[in-house]
A protein has these predicted regions:
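A short, basic N-terminal segment
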Residues: 1-99, 422-426
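P-loop NTPase Walker A phosphate-binding motif
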Residues: 85-97, 107-127
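Conserved P-loop NTPase "ATPase switch" module shared by AAA+ and STAND
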Residues: 130-174, 192
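The catalytic "switch" region of P-loop NTPases
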Residues: 175-283, 290-291, 305, 312
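Winged-helix-like regulatory helical subdomains adjacent to P-loop NTPase cores
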Residues: 297, 301-380
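Short amphipathic alpha-helical interaction segments
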Residues: 375-391, 396
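Minor-groove-contacting beta-hairpin "wing" of winged helix-turn-helix DNA-binding domains
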Residues: 400-406
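Short, amphipathic alpha-helical interaction segments positioned at domain boundaries
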Residues: 408-426
Length: 426
């Protein structure tokens, strides 16, 4: 059995869509919950924090070479999600009278759902309308709405519904009419929408009453991350690499089944497997699962970030002794409490929170549109974006607009929820 066949078998069951009400975030280990609660209280009492600066500084420490990262990190998974969408769309019935004939899938940063919807639509021959420009949304999008009346028997795919409205007094009319048109024509439709926009549009337009049912990717807990990251790291395991925690020397990642003994996919050298016992791993990936909210795109961003920590000086002597049996190089991972992820400046940061909330509601925006929809000056927006990029929670999108980064999403989510913003499901 070759490695590609093994990997295909192991992927089965990873990418499952569940009803939104069935989505459950992985539980945070008890000790971590207490630790984070105390740290959050301390940051609020101090009124300032330098963790963001520390996180940015640690980004440039011991970066793994790109050729090794390709053997360690998961690749695109939108094809697996597209297959799940095809399975689902054949089983979901109409949402009922007065509802859109279709269903919605909620998205999160880096989860590949938008790409999966596009891929499925291309294979099925469904049209995918391009996002409207801000000026078209504000003007009502008449030409687009008229086009929906053509070929109504052909299903429609909308990967990013949040790109069809603006939080502006003239920015909701188009989306209202779009939903009305879909209901009246009965045109089959598959919609993707980020979870923050969905919560906002459900409150402001009642979209959850006309576009249902709603699905989400089943949360990735620690064991599911073990499977996913383990299968992705087949190349690294075959090259003799091991993943160990820098304080104890215990494994963080166990070899995927396809490179275990007798599989025909290579040899396993992990201690314990040779004795027929399960490989003992730390709870590092349980922490990643909980902190990422079970979102795969966020989890893989954290995993990549954590693999940058490789200072030998930070490796305990007992850990180095444990690694002496490794037949190849050891990739050291810091214990979870010592991983410094991006964070926001502590205290009330109203301009920063307004910018972040706008980005989450719309997926991504450029500075010009931010000035249209926010009660902030252009100078405040530019300065705020510079601060957020420096913190590592905002990044430039391929089209030059701005978006919340997958790595920074948990910190942004925590901050906005803490300030009472209407938050998404994740």
């Amino acid at each position: 059995m070759d490695s590609s066949t093994c990997a295909e078998v192991e992927r089965n069951g990873l990418w499952t869509l569940v009803r939104l009400e069935e989505f459950r975030q992985p539980a945070r280990p008890a000790a971590e919950a207490v630790r984070r609660g105390l740290l959050g209280l301390w940051d609020r009492l101090r009124g300032s924090s330098n963790t963001a600066a520390e996180a940015v500084a640690e980004k440039d420490l011991c970066v793994l070479p790109e050729d090794l990262l390709k053997d360690v990190l998961p690749g695109d998974h939108f094809r697996e999600v597209a297959a799940e969408l095809r399975r689902l769309q054949g089983t979901v019935s109409n949402g009922g009278a007065g509802a859109v004939n279709g269903f919605a899938v909620l998205r999160a940063p880096g989860d590949g759902i938008a790409s999966a919807i596009r891929a499925m639509a291309e294979e099925e021959g469904w049209p995918v309308p391009p996002p409207l420009k801000a000026e078209e949304i504000l003007a009502g999008g008449e030409a687009f709405l008229e086009s929906l009346l053509l070929n109504v028997d052909v299903p429609l795919a909308i990967p990013e519904l949040e790109s069809f409205y603006l939080r502006h007094h003239l920015g909701f009319g188009f989306l209202r009419r779009l939903l009305e048109t879909l209901v009246v024509t009965g045109r089959r439709c598959l919609v993707g929408c980020n979870s923050w926009a969905w919560a906002f549009l459900s409150r402001s337009l009642g979209i959850d009453r006309v576009l249902k049912p709603v699905y989400a990717l089943e949360a990735f807990d620690g064991e599911r991350l073990q499977r996913w990251f383990g299968e992705a790291a087949v190349g690294a395991f075959q090259r003799g690499f091991s993943f160990r925690q820098a304080d104890s020397g215990r494994y963080v990642l166990r070899a995927a089944p396809e490179i275990g003994s007798g599989s025909g996919c290579g040899d396993s050298e992990q201690e314990g497997e040779k004795q027929g016992a399960p490989v003992d791993v730390t709870d590092f990936l349980r922490h990643v699962a909980a902190y990422s909210r079970g979102l795969p795109g966020v989890a893989v961003a954290i995993w990549r970030f954590s693999l940058r920590f490789a200072y030998e000086a930070e490796v305990e002597e007992k850990a180095q002794k444990a690694a002496a049996v490794d037949r190849g190089a050891t990739i050291w991972v810091k214990p979870w409490p010592r991983v410094t992820l991006p964070s926001l400046p502590a205290g009330r940061q109203v301009p920063l929170h307004l910018i972040l909330h706008a980005l989450l509601l719309h997926g991504r925006l450029d500075g010009r549109i931010l000035q249209k929809i926010l009660p902030l000056s252009g100078t405040d927006i530019i300065a705020g974006l510079a601060t957020l990029v420096g913190c590592g929670v905002v990044e430039a999108a391929p089209d030059g607009s701005w978006q919340v980064s997958a790595l920074g999403y948990p910190a942004v989510d925590d901050a906005l929820r803490g300030e009472g913003y209407l938050a998404g499901a994740f």
